[in-house]
């Protein structure tokens, strides 16, 4: 049965991360360049938060301005740090967790992405899109 499959089979393994000291402009560039919507925030090797593209949109005009109008975003981004904007109360799953476990968490919580850990180390990220794509295959 599909729901007993481990999350490690559907997670993104090459995780793009942000350092907690990076700035929000760097975050926006990573979101757009890599066409992603969630980036784990780390301090050294420890994950301390998750920044979503939606978090950026809440404080800026990132989707509403042209590249020529970046000054607006720069001013807003300089008012906040990643740590002020990111989600801090994360729920993570182990790489050995089942897809059913992940589906239950995502369906009951307000998260759209979960960090995947192996012995406390970040080894992947799983999103609602990963889950849906797996289920429709």
Give the role of each language-model region.
Residues 25, 45, 74-75, 120:
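Residue-level signal for alpha-helical context at structural boundaries
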Residues 31, 39-55, 106, 114-129:
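A glycine-centered beta-loop-beta connector
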Residues 18-35, 42, 83-87, 92-110, ...:
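The conserved cystathionine-beta-synthase
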Residues 1-14, 53-91, 98, 103-107, ...:
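Tandem CBS (Bateman) regulatory domains
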